[in-house]
């Protein structure tokens, strides 16, 4: 086997990291203060479980952290892991929210998945967890 063939058979760095998809968090630096964090992920992709066609969405995450805060590179790589996943819009939004809640235990969290129109249909799925506190 040539070195080129050996390299081709090994997953690329990005593919390995995406496959791991670990949501890493760090301690909230100000747990006594209510505040909100807004994260936008404009390049979410998954596959339609019915047609196999790609679906594209902007994910908008707004949350009030509890004991832990989500690390940004980790959430990017986690979201990228959905690229080849056959999943409905509704299940994608709910599963992502569930995984984020387990990882960081927020006081309150809302995820909006704004999917690009396909076939003249525009879908926005909004899911939430917990009770929003005044900041």
Swiss-Prot record:
It comes from Prochlorococcus marinus (strain MIT 9303). The keyword Nucleotide-binding does not apply. It comes from the Bacteria. Gene3D superfamilies: 3.30.1130.10. Pathway: tRNA modification; tRNA-queuosine biosynthesis. Catalyzes the NADPH-dependent reduction of 7-cyano-7-deazaguanine (preQ0) to 7-aminomethyl-7-deazaguanine (preQ1). GO terms for biological process: queuosine biosynthetic process; tRNA modification. One of its GO terms (cellular component) is cytoplasm. It is an enzyme of class 1 (oxidoreductase). It is found in: Cytoplasm. Belongs to the GTP cyclohydrolase I family. QueF type 1 subfamily. It catalyses: 7-aminomethyl-7-carbaguanine + 2 NADP(+) = 7-cyano-7-deazaguanine + 2 NADPH + 3 H(+). Keywords: Cytoplasm, NADP, Oxidoreductase, Queuosine biosynthesis. GO terms for molecular function: preQ1 synthase activity. Substrate binds at residues 70-72, 89-90. Transmembrane segments: none annotated. This is NADPH-dependent 7-cyano-7-deazaguanine reductase. Its EC number is 1.7.1.13. NCBIfam families: QueF-II (TIGR03139). The keyword Metal-binding does not apply.
């Amino acid at each position: 086997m040539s070195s080129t063939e050996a390299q081709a058979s090994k997953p690329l760095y990005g593919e390995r990291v995406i496959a791991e998809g670990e949501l890493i968090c760090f301690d909230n630096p100000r747990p006594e203060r209510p505040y909100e964090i807004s994260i936008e992920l404009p390049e979410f992709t998954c596959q339609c479980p019915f047609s196999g066609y790609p679906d594209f969405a902007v994910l908008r995450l707004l949350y009030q952290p509890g004991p832990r805060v989500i690390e940004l590179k980790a959430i990017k790589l986690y979201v990228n892991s959905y690229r080849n996943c056959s999943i409905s819009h509704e299940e994608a939004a709910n599963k992502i929210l569930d995984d984020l809640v387990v990882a960081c235990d927020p006081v309150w969290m809302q995820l909006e998945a704004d999917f690009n129109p396909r076939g003249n249909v525009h879908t926005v799925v909004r899911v939430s967890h917990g009770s929003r506190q005044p900041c």
